[in-house]
Swiss-Prot record:
Binding site for Mg(2+): S173, T193
Family of the protein in this entry: Belongs to the TRAFAC class OBG-HflX-like GTPase superfamily. OBG GTPase family.
A GO-annotated cellular component: cytoplasm
Keyword Zinc-finger among record annotations: no
All residue ranges annotated as the OBG-type G domain in the record: 160-333
EC number, UniProt record: 3.6.5.-
GO annotation, biological process: ribosome biogenesis
Full protein name: GTPase Obg
Amino acid sequence: MKFVDEAVIRVEAGDGGSGCVSFRREKYIPDGGPDGGDGGDGGSVYLEADENFNTLIEYRFERFHMAERGENGRGRDCTGHSGKDLILKVPVGTRAIDHDTEEVLGDLTTHGQKLLVAKGGFHGLGNTRFKSSTNRAPRQKTLGTPGEVRSLKLELLLLADVGLLGMPNAGKSTFIRAVSRATPKVADYPFTTLVPNLGVVNPRPGQSYVIADIPGLIEGAAEGAGLGIRFLKHLERCRILLHIIDIEPIDGTDPVDSARAIVGELEKYSPKLASKPRWLVFNKADLLLEDELKEKAERVVKELGWEGEVYTISAYGRDGTKELAAKLWDFIQSLPPEDKDANPEDEVEFKWDNYHQANIDAINEDYDDDFDDDFDDDDYDVEVIYQR
């Protein structure tokens, strides 16, 4: 199935049902009074993370999603049915963003997690609610409020512990094949990898973590060169980045310039991502003699002013890959646990929360101000004819 990691959809929660104006009409019961019921609440729209989904392609072609409207109230104090909630299944790792305000509504990072993205309208009140000592036959009701409408931008961010960075043909896909059972396409031309790939690494029995390989970056990617930087977002949740450097490029380019270009594009995209722990990994060590390899690696480290971890491997020959995979596991385990700030029932702010109380208070205030002793002449009263 085609990998789609972005989609824009429109969600509409259901409107609340309106209240009913009705009076009790029953034999032998004079002056039955009001019996209009309330309407039902409108259905809300939720996103739910499902591990059985791995792409947003369904929402690329189906963009409009509406929850059910609440039913209107009826006589005999019958309340209308509430509208059914609409639950949209999305892959684990999906982020919901308000397309108009760019507000991040939430991240769905665990299976079964739900996020409320559009709240259904509040139900209207029937005339029974407005009965009082000064208004015995009310003909007032309130309408249901509109459901919330949002344009959502859905972004799928891969959940991985380790992310791979590097120029095209640096050997990232070969490395992920060497340390996991993933089988991304490998060839001797640039941009072989067109979509992100995930692999599960098992460095020792009972140990595992996930590694993500994204398409290669080139200088100017922030301006749209190559495949751009749109896939860098998949590294945002990684706990450590591996910067794969081709120590002996076939086109004769300087590894120092290539490394600086990658760091520059990373900083342009996100300073936060650029500040993540990052290790330098010199690949294709099998193409050079040991002394020449050491000399080149030391020159790159010196010119970059690099003070972090440095490793030399041959992904093709799998030299040093097993040791690197084990050290990555040890490093990940040494990090503090990630903050779990996502609330499975996270709700968005809704403007109608105090709607009913405000309406009732306002109407009762009007009656208290205008009430006089002559009930029949009250401005708010109505003529009611009861039949026996």
